[in-house]
Amino acid sequence: MLPTAHAECTGACDAQQRIATADAYLATRPGAVGYVLRDRKTGAVYRNSHAGDMVWTASTIKLGMVVDLFARQSAGLLRLTDNDIALMGKMLHTSDNDAADTLWSRYGGPDHTIFNNDFPHFGMTRVQPQRGFGDMFPYWGFQKSTTDDLDQMVNYMLTRLRPNETAWIVNAMQHVDPIQQWGVWGAGPNMAPGNKDGWSDEQGGWVTNTVGFAGPGQRFTLAVMNALNGAGGNADGQATTTRLSQILLADRQ
C-alpha cells in the first residue's frame, strides 16, 4: 500500500494564509491601516500598502524616547537617575503624558530638538514634528511618522541596546496597564506579547497605533498604525488593531 500524501501548511505557508486573512479583514474596517510584520528568526518581512503612510504617532513615540535615553546613556552622553527610570517606566506602563513631558523637557535640549535629531539613528528616518499645535516645538505629542519607522525602532530596541536595557523594556512592555492591553496584545497570553500603544483624536480623526513583539524570544515583531480618517473612533481602531494582531500572531509556531 502506498502512503497517503497530505499537505500540511507550516512556516511560510501559514504566514501567507494569515496575511491574506488579515488583508481581507482590513478591507472591511474603517480608515487606513498600515502594518509591518517581521519574523526575526527567518528574516521574513511583510509590509502592506499603507506601511509608508505618514500618520500621527500618538504615544508610540514614547518607546522611541526610552530607546533614545538608554542609547545616550550607553554613549556616555547622560546618566539616567532613578527618577528618570521611574518616569520611563510610567511612559511604558500607563502611557503617562506627564512623565513624557518631564523627560522631553529634561533631555530635549534648550531648543527641544535632541530627541528628533536622534530618532533617525534608530531607524525612524521619516518622523516629522508638526508645527502649530502648542507652545513647544518640537513636542513629542505632535509628531507624524510611518509604520515602517515603528518597525525599525522596535527592532533596534531588541537588537542594538545593551542586553539589560532591552530586557528592562521587554519586561515593561509585557506588563502594561490594562489601558494598553490591546493591539499587539491580541496575540494572546501564550505568545507573551508586549506592546506600546498610541491613541489620540488628532487633526483628521482618531489614530490607534500599536508596536510590539510576540513569541519565544520576541521572535515576531508587529507595528500597526490605524488612521481612522473620521470614519470611526477609538473603539473601532482598538478593535481593528487587536483583531489584526490576533490573526497575524496568535499561536504562531
Where are the language model's segments positioned?
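Conserved catalytic neighborhood of penicillin-recognizing serine enzymes
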Residues: Q73-T125
